[in-house]
A protein has these predicted regions:
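Aliphatic-rich helix starts adjacent to a transmembrane/signal segment
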Residues: 2-5, 9-53
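Flexible, low-complexity segments enriched in proline/glycine/serine and punctuated by aromatic residues
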Residues: 37-161
Length: 161
C-alpha cells in the first residue's frame, strides 16, 4: 500500500504506458509500409505517363500526318507503310522499342495503344485531331501480393500549324 506522499509508477501504469507506446510504434510502421507502396505506384505512373507523352510529342511534331498514327498497338508489329509514311513508321518502331526496352524494366506486360480521330465538322474547318494514348501494364504489388492490372489514358488535341 502507498503511504501518504509516495509517488511513482505502479506496475499497471507501466504496462499501460508500454501498450500505448507499442500501439503507436506499430501504427508508425504501418504508415511507413503504406507510404513505400504508394511511392512505388507513383513511380510506375510517372514512368508510364512519360512513355505516353513521348508518342504524343512525336505526333505533334508530325501533325500533318497525325492520322497515320491511328491504330498503333505496341503488342503487335507496326503496320504503317514505310514508303508513304516513313516518319510515322519510324516513330512507331522507336516507341515500340522504347516500351519493350531497358527503360521499361519493372513494368510487366507494358502495352501502348494510339487512337487518332478527326474532330469536326466545325465551321470554319479546324482540321484538328484528337489523340488518345492508352497504356496498360501489370503493376508491382510487392512481394506478398499478386500483380494488378493497371491502365492510364491521356488525351491530346493536335491542331495544324
Amino acid at each position: 500500500m502507498r503511504g501518504y506522499g509516495e509517488e511513482g509508477f505502479t506496475l499497471i501504469e507501466g504496462m499501460i504506458a508500454t501498450v500505448l507506446l507499442a500501439t503507436g510504434l506499430l501504427g508508425l510502421a504501418s504508415m511507413q509500409t503504406i507510404a513505400m507502396g504508394r511511392n512505388g505506384d507513383a513511380n510506375e505512373k510517372t514512368r508510364v505517363t512519360n512513355f505516353a507523352v513521348e508518342i504524343i510529342e512525336r505526333i505533334q511534331f508530325n501533325r500533318r500526318n497525325a492520322l497515320a498514327y491511328n491504330g498503333i498497338d505496341t503488342s503487335v508489329v507496326c503496320t504503317i507503310n514505310t514508303t508513304t509514311q516513313p516518319m510515322a513508321r519510324g516513330d512507331c518502331d522507336q516507341w515500340r522499342n522504347l516500351l519493350t526496352g531497358q527503360l521499361a524494366t519493372g513494368l510487366q506486360n507494358l502495352r501502348g495503344q494510339v487512337v487518332v480521330t478527326t474532330v469536326g465538322p466545325t465551321l470554319p474547318p479546324l482540321n484538328q485531331n484528337r489523340v488518345v494514348v492508352t497504356m496498360s501494364w501489370m503493376g508491382d504489388a510487392g512481394e506478398q501480393k499478386l500483380a494488378t492490372a493497371r491502365s492510364l489514358s491521356i488525351t491530346a488535341m493536335v491542331a495544324p500549324e
